[in-house]
Amino acid sequence: MSAFTPASEVLLRHSDDFEQSRILFAGDLQDDLPALFECAASRAHTQQFHHWQVLSRQMGDNVRFSLVAQASDVADCDTLIYYWPKNKPEAQFQLMNILSLMPSGSDVFVVGENRSGVRSAEQMLADYAPLNKVDSARRCGLYHGRLEKQPQFSLESWWAEYNIDGLTIKTLPGVFSRDGLDVGSQLLLSTLTPHTKGKVLDVGCGAGVLSAALASHSPKARLTLCDVSAPAVEASRATLAANGLEGEVFASNVFSEVKGRFDMIISNPPFHDGMQTSLDAAQTLIRGAVRHLNSGGELRIVANAFLPYPKILDETFGFHEVIAQTGRFKVYRTVMTRQAKK
């Protein structure tokens, strides 16, 4: 996070209107505006660990990372500024959660890029905080309303699940491939052989499908799963529990909270952060893997075929091989040897 996003720039056009406001920022917080905005008080809630990392340096305890907001997160706030994400169910989950805690009469602002579908906020909040569009600039929309009725929110009602090969996969809004196994992960799964042993790290674990499938035919594998997303962390824990599997699951910005070395690292790394294309996570994954692989350990990732990962793999490990591919995806494998750049 550094330069302001277009959505934040639209908000700054109205900064004078917020000088007396006690604001809760939430949603897709892609910059540090919540820490810098001139207002009476500022808090933030995020489901993204890497956003919390940045904001907590400036906001301290006034920003919290968790799956759901609690009453303490909205304490004394009279205004919500919500950054619309690209995922509509994720927006609905977060807004219903937060608005169930905000006092009636609170100002509600929703801002986001037009291509993200932000205009659907009007219909989503019609029964709770009817919205009017108050600005349109930088290909973004800014909407305002007042909270007339608090929605009811129960976390349990948001859980969903699907089944693959006898495994139950638990999911939540905002988790990658919430409605079923994606094609890339399916291709990566096809390359995993039974009776894998040793310590396995699943980076960007999503709903835990890769680890659950691996553990189902490799019971001696010791699993560690991590993701930047709070919904993904909770979904992975639930997936392991639903299938009687064990593993350590925690939030981490790629390797930021990972300790130790592993015999295998598997991943279907993201190449978007919110609406923006970003290869940062995948590059950090590949370059950082050398510090978390045992000698002879392997990195195995799946990616869209057009992404420039072969170059980064070769620069870091000295070589790579493609062990499976379709027209759209490739599974890359490389091994920790002496020639890897530590």
From Swiss-Prot:
A GO CC term attached to the entry: cytoplasm
UniProt GO molecular function: 16S rRNA (guanine(1207)-N(2))-methyltransferase activity; nucleic acid binding
Keyword rRNA processing in record: yes
Annotated keywords: Cytoplasm, Methyltransferase, rRNA processing, S-adenosyl-L-methionine, Transferase
Entry keyword annotation includes Transcription: no
Catalytic activity field: guanosine(1207) in 16S rRNA + S-adenosyl-L-methionine = N(2)-methylguanosine(1207) in 16S rRNA + S-adenosyl-L-homocysteine + H(+)
Pfam families: MTS, MTS_N
Subcellular localization(s) per the UniProt record: Cytoplasm
Coiled coil stretches, renumbered: none
EC number: 2.1.1.172
Family statement: Belongs to the methyltransferase superfamily. RsmC family.
Subunit field text: Monomer.
Function: Specifically methylates the guanine in position 1207 of 16S rRNA in the 30S particle.
NCBIfam families in the cross-refs: PRK09489.1
Record protein name field: Ribosomal RNA small subunit methyltransferase C
Organism of this sequence: Salmonella choleraesuis (strain SC-B67)
